[in-house]
């Protein structure tokens, strides 16, 4: 199997969110699967223009914006699992991931043109990894609900959201409990894909 991971933390490889991604990757790759990680803060991803240029071709993304989304479109189309990984700062994902989500749902769901087409993501699985400063059920609940609806609309299978709370900058994030919970989530995703 193959996974496409959209990682969207401004703190990069030293972030708490990246720690969860690394645990997920360790479990995923140990099972013999491939993964491609895109660090969205290192890429140029423009917001969707809602121009509907992508709707003229029902077989490919065909986005008219020439930026770093092109390899992401291809990776998503080749993957069985899509993973969104973002810290939760204002009850939702960071801006680069939101821009990528908007571009994906327009370019890969051919629902918005003169004739209705398919979702090119139909049947793929999606899960999310998040970190936050509040309790996960109070910080990531809106993102969780948004992803449920996003999946229903785009005809993906929603496998769930895993979140971990960081108690503050002066405290250690990656505790044995957080690491164990993240690995367990990854194992469950393996069984569900």
Task: Show the residue positions of the predicted features.
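Short, glycine-/small-residue-rich phosphate/pyrophosphate-handling segment
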Residues: 112-159
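N-terminal beta1-alpha1-beta2 submodule of the flavodoxin-like/Rossmannoid cofactor-binding fold
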Residues: 1-86, 90-109, 113, 169-172, ...
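Beta-strand-loop-alpha "switch" segments that mediate conformational coupling across diverse proteins
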Residues: 160-165
């Amino acid at each position: 199997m193959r996974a496409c991971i959209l990682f969207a933390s401004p703190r990069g490889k030293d972030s708490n969110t990246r720690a969860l991604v690394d645990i997920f990757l360790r479990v995923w790759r140990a099972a013999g699967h491939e993964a491609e990680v895109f660090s969205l803060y290192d890429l140029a991803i423009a917001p969707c223009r809602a121009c509907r240029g992508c709707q003229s071709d029902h077989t490919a993304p065909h986005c008219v914006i020439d930026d770093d989304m092109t390899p992401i479109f291809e990776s998503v189309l080749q993957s069985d699992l899509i993973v969104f990984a973002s810290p939760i700062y204002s009850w939702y994902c960071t801006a680069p991931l939101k821009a990528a989500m908007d571009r994906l749902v327009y370019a890969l769901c051919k629902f918005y043109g003169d004739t209705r087409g398919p979702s090119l993501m139909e049947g793929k699985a999606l899960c999310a990894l998040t970190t936050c400063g509040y309790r996960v059920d109070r910080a990531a609940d809106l993102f969780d609900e948004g992803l449920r609806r996003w999946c229903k609309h785009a005809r993906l299978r929603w496998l769930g959201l895993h979140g971990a709370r960081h108690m503050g900058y002066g405290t250690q994030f990656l505790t044995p409990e957080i690491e164990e919970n993240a690995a367990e989530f990854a194992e469950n995703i393996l069984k569900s894909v």
